[in-house]
Amino acid sequence: MSRIGKKPVSVPAGVTAAIEGKTLSVKGPKGTLSISLADEVSYAIEDGSISVQPINETKRARSFWGMQRTLVQNLITGVTEGYSKTLQITGVGYRANVQGKNLKLQLGYSHDVDFAIPEGITIATPDQTTVQISGIDKQKVGQVAAEIRRWRKPEPYKGKGIKYAGEYIFRKEGKKK
């Protein structure tokens, strides 16, 4: 039994959900999101909530049960509140700024890195060493943050690089004489 899957997902006021064929669409104040539905799980919209139940008791159906319920919850949270991630840049001369549809990163390379901002994602730079990524799709926000971080991961000796806000970097001791 999935403890997560048992709980129905409540649909708040101002949000509409509809099942059309094998697609669940959710529309809210921030936009519209949709996912394709799994065949192993049945979905029902009733009384302002969406319930997810496995069709049979196979291991595959039970494993999809909790995951699909969480994906539905992510859709509803995305269209009501949205998601955001914050990256911090550490290092001498390392900086970032938004220029039009591109994020320009100076990360100690011989050239600047231009990162094209994808559709549906908003990137802001409150200061030169902070990058805020926000959007309504949780997966897309996390993927963009990971792609930006990949350009210069934090190194363990001085901690230079791009890290998530609140991320702990395990520091190593340097050479000894």
From Swiss-Prot:
SUPFAM superfamilies assigned: Ribosomal protein L6 (SSF56053)
UniProt cross-references to InterPro entries, sorted A to Z: Ribosomal_uL6-like, Ribosomal_uL6-like_a/b-dom_sf, Ribosomal_uL6_a/b-dom, Ribosomal_uL6_bac-type, Ribosomal_uL6_CS
Keyword Glycosyltransferase belongs to the record: no
GO cellular component terms, semicolon-separated: cytosolic large ribosomal subunit
Keyword annotations: Ribonucleoprotein, Ribosomal protein, RNA-binding, rRNA-binding
Highest taxon of source: Bacteria
Classification via Pfam families: Ribosomal_L6
Transmembrane segments: none
Entry keyword annotation includes Signal: no
GO MF term set: rRNA binding; structural constituent of ribosome
Any one of the GO BP annotations: cytoplasmic translation
Subunit field text: Part of the 50S ribosomal subunit.
Function: This protein binds to the 23S rRNA, and is important in its secondary structure. It is located near the subunit interface in the base of the L7/L12 stalk, and near the tRNA binding site of the peptidyltransferase center.
Family the UniProt entry places it in: Belongs to the universal ribosomal protein uL6 family.
Listed name of the protein: Large ribosomal subunit protein uL6
